[in-house]
Curated annotation (Swiss-Prot):
GO molecular function, one term: protein kinase activity
Entry keywords, A to Z: Immunoglobulin domain, Repeat
Species of the source: Homo sapiens (Human)
PROSITE patterns xref list: IG_LIKE (PS50835), IQ (PS50096)
Protein name (database record): SPEG neighbor protein
CDD domains named among the record's database cross-references: IQCD
InterPro entries on file: Cell_Adh-Cytoskel_Orgn, Ig-like_dom, Ig-like_dom_sf, Ig-like_fold, Ig_I-set, Ig_sub, Ig_sub2, IQ_motif_EF-hand-BS
Sequence ranges assigned to domain Ig-like in this UniProt record: 54-143, 147-236
IQ domain ranges (all copies): 29-55
Length: 238
């Protein structure tokens, strides 16, 4: 009588690594407990965050903007619930767009980027932070530096003897430039008859009771820490 063949034991096939977790594995259960505890702690910290009006933690600071470049004003704030941010320049609201960019670098840091710097960007910038519990604000200045230049030089002039001659140049620059005038390469020595004035955007040379000796080549020059410029004009008195 032949004996029956012994029954074969089922062969366990291990799942591919990373595909299946055995929830009965003590290590898996321990890891799950730690994850849940960490998540509950995170929720608790978030829920315990104090609600209230916004506060400025690190104020804005004055910055220097070079013509043609960009500048950034940065402020660190504390606010919960999340606030509404508004930036303004000299009291006028600035819209987020190509020229002015609202930047949120992390939950507590906000910034304003001013692009394509020009002299018109000089001024006081303010941030206003508002949430349902209140508001706070802060301000700083953007100081603009522009290489000096002569926007429009003086015109060549013909005058009659005894009349008054004026030569005017339109100038630009920040910091405000040093300005000078020369005649035939020599610095002009001012007196009550020949003198020049310097305004915020113009400089004017005045020659009273002009004589033929006042004829010549006149030069105006401007210079600041970022550059210099010059322009010429011819005066003929007869």
């Amino acid at each position: 009588m032949s004996k029956a063949a012994p029954a074969k034991k089922p062969v366990a096939v291990a799942p591919a690594p990373g595909c299946t977790l055995d929830i009965n594995d003590p290590q898996v259960q321990s890891a799950a407990i730690r994850i849940q505890a960490s998540y509950r702690g995170h929720r608790s910290r978030k829920e315990l965050r104090e609600k209230g009006p916004p506060r400025v933690l690190e104020p804005l600071k004055d910055v220097v903007l070079i013509e043609g470049s960009a500048a950034k004003l940065t402020c660190r704030i504390s606010a919960f619930p999340d606030p509404f941010i508004r930036w303004s320049k000299d009291g006028k609201e600035l819209r987020d767009g190509p020229k002015y960019r609202y930047v949120f670098e992390d939950p507590d840091v906000v910034a304003l980027v001013v692009r394509d710097g020009e002299l018109a960007d000089l001024g006081q910038y303010s941030i206003n932070v508002t949430n349902p519990f209140g508001q706070c604000s802060d301000s700083a200045r953007i100081l603009v530096e522009v290489p000096t230049k002569i926007q429009k030089g003086p015109d060549n002039t013909k005058a009659r003897k005894g009349t008054t001659v004026t030569l005017t140049a339109e100038i630009l620059g920040e910091p405000a430039p040093d300005v000078g005038w020369t005649k035939d390469g020599e610095d002009i020595e001012e007196d009550d008859r020949v003198f020049f004035e310097i305004g915020s955007t113009t400089t004017t040379l005045t020659i009273r009771r002009a004589t033929p000796q006042d004829s010549g080549k006149y030069e105006v020059y401007v210079e600041n820490s970022l550059g210099m410029d010059q322009s010429f004009a011819r005066v003929d008195v007869a």
